[in-house]
């Protein structure tokens, strides 16, 4: 079911970014189906937020702010929130990042490449270093990958 949702997400992004008469109709059709699957899975993921290679391991509430930006090959392990403070910009997350179960990234923060955000971590400030692990509330760097 997750694969179907991701497939529909990418199809909707394609039709949304294309200009033309029939693509609007196809977009509406696929977007309706994507939203239907998203309700069953608990996903609220706007279009054109994630780069290629998004991988989701588990169902559960995944809420993403439409002003967020996530790089390529991101992995989400379920029940994750990428949000904003008071309607502002959402987080910007680099390539090859992994978001653990129940992780939260809130506000206009920047996260580097190859970052692991641990289960239950709450990130409220920027960590632009690459290849680090973040855990805790509020999140702190606990390891540098080599």
State where each predicted segment sits.
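Conserved long hydrophobic alpha-helices within structured protein cores
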Residues: 8-11, 68-76, 113-117, 121
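A generic structural signal for short
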Residues: 22-23, 59, 100
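Left-handed beta-helix
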Residues: 28-73, 80-87, 103
